[in-house]
Amino acid sequence: MVGWIRYVLGLGMDVVLNLHDEYKAILDMFEKQQVTYPVKAFFGELLERPRRTKAYPIALINQNINLDQLLAINNAMKYPLAYIQGPPGTGKTNTIINTIVTAFFNNTTVLFASYNNVPIDNVFEKLTHLEYHGQTIPFPVLRLGNIDKVKAAISYINRLRNQVQTVKIFTSTLDKRKDDRIDRAKRLSARLKEYEEILDLKERKETLSHLMEYQEHIKNAMNLLPFQMDLQGYQMQRLDQRIHQIGEISDSDALQLLDRNEEEFYQYLFYTSARYIKTLEEPKYQELREILDSGENPETQARAFNKYMQKSENVKKLQRVFPVIITTCISAHKIGEPEPLFDMTIMDEASQCNVAISLVPIIRGEKLMLVGDPQQLN
């Protein structure tokens, strides 16, 4: 079933990555029958459609979004697997950013990875430059990677620690509209489910139309007459009735079910983010603080940080401060042991990452969102 993986080598330009630990972890998953949905799908073992989970409130940092993008975010949160494809200019990056913010809002940890630095740097740049009342929101996202990226990450963490020192957190005010958000989430989820059904119905209707056109070309074949009558008189009619029953759904219909109080949401992001960063000052983070405050040369600090991150238990502790971690597919192997450490892995430009290397971030997530161009994503 997966015996062939021992022969897969991960090559990335001049980088050779030893994936022995990843392969062993996958084999252990299968032996213990604890295989995640993403790994099942990777090896063609996902033989039935995964069930939906609960409805998650969708949280947006902007309103530059349409129904298809909302559906992508909704499905990424509700299903263990989501495949998002679209050509350049269709809002894939905006969808990724809003998915990450939605995940953060729902206490979901995220590993965002790509084979290339550019897409993940763009997302990191946007997430770290959100503002509330002229102040930068200390959004708890960490960019890791090679030794230089880790040096920058250590400096960035210490800047955030200094920034939030004087911020007072009033926890009771942060969740005062939680029930309203949950109710909106349920209604939006139901509406998006109907929109998804309409897309499916229209696709089936188009297929039937092509079949009927084909029948016209061979209408002399009497043995096909009952089939043609079934298409025209029953199946097409049922599709039309259901489409009419649901009705048209516009972008504005869905947006009305979102929390559109941007001022209040940015306030929530600011203070909730600050609360996450302040967690780093708790006693259980002493080992990490010693690395951050060591005063040693940056390279020594970075190597100590990488050593700290090799242990899964330390990664899980860090996630309580930085629930969103961004890195390349190759550098993801430095994050803990090869096991599902994150609630969700998001992989951008998915097909540009070779098959072997893609396993590194995939194995570290309970769920998977693949994003790419139709000309690239297979």
Model-identified regions with their sequence ranges:
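Pre-P-loop entry segment of helicase/translocase ATPase cores
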Residues: 1-75, 150-176, 288-305
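Short, glycine-/Ser/Thr-/acidic-enriched flexible segments
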Residues: 48-49, 79-80, 89, 117, ...
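Phosphate-binding P-loop
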Residues: 64, 73-81, 102-106
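Walker A/P-loop
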Residues: 67, 78-99
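Short, conserved phosphate/pyrophosphate- and ester-handling motifs at nucleotide-, phospho-/glycolipid
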Residues: 69, 116, 373
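Short hydrophobic alpha-helical runs that function as membrane-insertion/retention elements
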Residues: 83-85, 104, 109-113, 368-372
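Alpha-helical nucleic-acid-binding subdomain
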Residues: 99, 106-111, 115-343, 354-357
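Conserved helicase motor core of SF1/SF2 NTP-dependent helicases
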Residues: 330-347, 351-378
